[in-house]
Amino acid sequence: MATLTTTQTSPSLLGGVVIIGGTIIGAGMFSLPVVMSGAWFFWSMAALIFTWFCMLHSGLMILEANLNYRIGSSFDTITKDLLGKGWNVVNGISIAFVLYILTYAYISASGSILHHTFAEMSLNVPARAAGFGFALLVAFVVWLSTKAVSRMTAIVLGAKVITFFLTFGSLLGHVQPATLFNVAESNASYAPYLLMTLPFCLASFGYHGNVPSLMKYYGKDPKTIVKCLVYGTLMALALYTIWLLATMGNIPRPEFIGIAEKGGNIDVLVQALSGVLNSRSLDLLLVVFSNFAVASSFLGVTLGLFDYLADLFGFDDSAVGRLKTALLTFAPPVVGGLLFPNGFLYAIGYAGLAATIWAAIVPALLARASRKRFGSPKFRVWGGKPMIALILVFGVGNALVHILSSFNLLPVYQ
């Protein structure tokens, strides 16, 4: 397995776009209609667009700092050098927590949707066993190489996009304006539930662990990597918009309360959509799409965790070194998935809390420190100090929202 560095033939732009897009657009999107049902469609779209803007720029700030270090340097190296040991420990804990808990969430989600898929074929496969088997398959692909993940993600994302448009093209045809505009509730309030959506929005635009992986893939080519981040995140925003239209235009707002009470996992939402549409072919497409959605996100997130742990522990890129990294990457979340198979919605929410440190606060601090030391000779994010301040406020604000929510100090749609 060769280390990926800049070569005479540069990898295609599409490979990087699908790594970013595939990481973002995955199982996390299934939580959005459930947690956004209180704020409903238009307020939720405002939250998504604002979050997309902030998360894109925080990723660009990571790139700005990363370009001043050797290819293969991950957050551990960069944060320790620019911000010191204290911030490095805090950042390291938040990275490990986010990536581990997202890996656990996708094991939970894969077990749930595979159990539902096998049930459609009259096969009884327990969710725990299905999630465990799927995790082993993903572990093998990640162990092979970054290029293997890129190629597999490209295949899965391609299949996911095809099934997405087949499924949601049909779903959009069933959208009821009265349902989307929530005509049935004449005195409904939406704005009070807006803050609750922000940590989930943040978790649904998580790709930051893959920025160092892209530098490994393309070398120090900021122009190409910036395009990967912009196109990948825009792809996610577009598909989230279609997803919210398709779900909130078909499932009445009050029905989401029952979906949330059942844990909000993928199979519950798929069953709710199937019940509304009463279409066997659409039901099958939904199930197929759900499987591809989990697979692409699972691959991207675990690649980020894999590269971070390899850098942290100094494991080399040999078969044995990658095996050690793979064991550290997958063993803890697999155990969690076997013990607690239904924690998807809770895991996504807590990932949003920890991700505020790693995906918003620390990137802004890295950009500021990098400019002071290096002057950002290769690439600089536009906006100057005000942009850094905005990303910091965004991160701290998200953390406060989640803490207030944990103590039941924010209104909940129920």
Swiss-Prot record:
<feature type="transmembrane region" description="Helical">
    <location>
        <begin position="387"/>
        <end position="407"/>
    </location>
</feature>
<comment type="function">
    <text>Involved in the transport of tryptophan into the cell.</text>
</comment>
<dbReference type="GO" id="GO:0003333">
    <property type="term" value="P:amino acid transmembrane transport"/>
</dbReference>
<dbReference type="InterPro" id="IPR013059">
    <property type="entry name" value="Trp_tyr_transpt"/>
</dbReference>
<feature type="topological domain" description="Cytoplasmic">
    <location>
        <begin position="1"/>
        <end position="15"/>
    </location>
</feature>
<dbReference type="GO" id="GO:0015293">
    <property type="term" value="F:symporter activity"/>
</dbReference>
<dbReference type="InterPro" id="IPR013061">
    <property type="entry name" value="Trp/try_permease_CS"/>
</dbReference>
<feature type="transmembrane region" description="Helical">
    <location>
        <begin position="286"/>
        <end position="306"/>
    </location>
</feature>
<protein>
    <recommendedName>
        <fullName>Tryptophan-specific transport protein</fullName>
    </recommendedName>
</protein>
<feature type="topological domain" description="Periplasmic">
    <location>
        <begin position="37"/>
        <end position="41"/>
    </location>
</feature>
<dbReference type="GO" id="GO:0015827">
    <property type="term" value="P:tryptophan transport"/>
</dbReference>
<feature type="transmembrane region" description="Helical">
    <location>
        <begin position="89"/>
        <end position="109"/>
    </location>
</feature>
<keyword id="KW-1003">Cell membrane</keyword>
<feature type="topological domain" description="Cytoplasmic">
    <location>
        <begin position="63"/>
        <end position="88"/>
    </location>
</feature>
<dbReference type="Pfam" id="PF03222">
    <property type="entry name" value="Trp_Tyr_perm"/>
</dbReference>
<feature type="transmembrane region" description="Helical">
    <location>
        <begin position="129"/>
        <end position="149"/>
    </location>
</feature>
<keyword id="KW-0029">Amino-acid transport</keyword>
<feature type="topological domain" description="Periplasmic">
    <location>
        <begin position="110"/>
        <end position="128"/>
    </location>
</feature>
<keyword id="KW-0813">Transport</keyword>
<feature type="topological domain" description="Cytoplasmic">
    <location>
        <begin position="307"/>
        <end position="325"/>
    </location>
</feature>
<feature type="topological domain" description="Cytoplasmic">
    <location>
        <begin position="150"/>
        <end position="151"/>
    </location>
</feature>
<dbReference type="GO" id="GO:0015196">
    <property type="term" value="F:L-tryptophan transmembrane transporter activity"/>
</dbReference>
<feature type="topological domain" description="Periplasmic">
    <location>
        <begin position="408"/>
        <end position="414"/>
    </location>
</feature>
<feature type="topological domain" description="Periplasmic">
    <location>
        <begin position="173"/>
        <end position="193"/>
    </location>
</feature>
<feature type="transmembrane region" description="Helical">
    <location>
        <begin position="194"/>
        <end position="214"/>
    </location>
</feature>
<feature type="transmembrane region" description="Helical">
    <location>
        <begin position="152"/>
        <end position="172"/>
    </location>
</feature>
<dbReference type="GO" id="GO:0022857">
    <property type="term" value="F:transmembrane transporter activity"/>
</dbReference>
<feature type="transmembrane region" description="Helical">
    <location>
        <begin position="347"/>
        <end position="367"/>
    </location>
</feature>
<feature type="transmembrane region" description="Helical">
    <location>
        <begin position="229"/>
        <end position="249"/>
    </location>
</feature>
<comment type="similarity">
    <text>Belongs to the amino acid/polyamine transporter 2 family. Mtr/TnaB/TyrP permease subfamily.</text>
</comment>
<dbReference type="GO" id="GO:0005886">
    <property type="term" value="C:plasma membrane"/>
</dbReference>
<keyword id="KW-0472">Membrane</keyword>
<feature type="transmembrane region" description="Helical">
    <location>
        <begin position="42"/>
        <end position="62"/>
    </location>
</feature>
<feature type="transmembrane region" description="Helical">
    <location>
        <begin position="326"/>
        <end position="346"/>
    </location>
</feature>
<dbReference type="InterPro" id="IPR018227">
    <property type="entry name" value="Amino_acid_transport_2"/>
</dbReference>
<feature type="transmembrane region" description="Helical">
    <location>
        <begin position="16"/>
        <end position="36"/>
    </location>
</feature>
<keyword id="KW-0812">Transmembrane</keyword>
<feature type="topological domain" description="Periplasmic">
    <location>
        <begin position="250"/>
        <end position="285"/>
    </location>
</feature>
<feature type="topological domain" description="Cytoplasmic">
    <location>
        <begin position="368"/>
        <end position="386"/>
    </location>
</feature>
<feature type="topological domain" description="Cytoplasmic">
    <location>
        <begin position="215"/>
        <end position="228"/>
    </location>
</feature>
<keyword id="KW-0769">Symport</keyword>
<keyword id="KW-0997">Cell inner membrane</keyword>
